[in-house]
């Protein structure tokens, strides 16, 4: 019996096909349990969740996936938890919140990625959020560190972003362009 081998492409050991695009190159993951923490700041603060990756290609795309928790001090608060991702010292939030905007304009001057409501009357309950963002502009093969930043939108609110035992995580995936 004669054998026949037919393939559309051969993927090298580096994980990316020659002239291929969209292939997963690598994944990095971090998860943390922080002690109890909160803020009243209306300026973005680094909340301690970060992950680093060294892209193999300067043209690749980095998909950032985040899962986190938040809640406010009081059930009657009507504030927003505002979140964004920094790549090293660059805020990747452009203020275009799409359907997550707080008004009908779909834009914001807040340089953020996500706004999460206090959800009055359950603002003091533990609220979880997750979101994904694709960084298409890193243009680097040096190590990149992505960090989650959060803040209150209004003064007078106390935003809790960590509690003992709660797991938060960030995943970075590099895809070939």
Language model features by range: what are they?
Residues 2-38, 177:
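Glycine-rich, low-complexity segments
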Residues 30-31, 36-39, 43, 55-143, ...:
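Terminal beta-strand-rich extracellular "head" domains
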Residues 45-47:
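Short, solvent-exposed loop/turn segments enriched in Ser/Thr/Gly
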Residues 49-51:
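Extended, low-complexity regulatory regions
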């Amino acid at each position: 019996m004669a054998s026949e081998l037919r393939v559309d492409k051969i993927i090298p050991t580096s994980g990316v096909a020659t002239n291929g695009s969209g292939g997963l190159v690598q994944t990095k993951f971090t998860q943390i349990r922080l002690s109890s923490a909160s803020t009243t700041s209306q300026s973005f603060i680094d909340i301690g969740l970060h992950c680093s990756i060294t892209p193999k290609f300067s043209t690749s795309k980095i998909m950032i996936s985040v899962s986190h928790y938040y809640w406010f001090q009081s059930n009657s608060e009507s504030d927003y938890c505002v979140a964004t991702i920094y790549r090293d010292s660059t805020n990747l939030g452009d203020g275009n919140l799409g359907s997550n905007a707080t008004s009908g304009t779909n834009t914001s001057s807040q340089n953020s990625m996500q706004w999460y409501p206090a959800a009055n009357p359950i603002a003091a309950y533990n609220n979880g959020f997750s979101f994904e963002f694709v960084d298409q502009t890193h243009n680097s093969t040096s190590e990149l560190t992505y960090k989650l930043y959060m803040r209150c939108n209004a003064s007078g609110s106390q935003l809790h972003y960590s509690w003992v035992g709660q797991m938060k995580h960030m995943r970075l995936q590099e895809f070939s362009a």
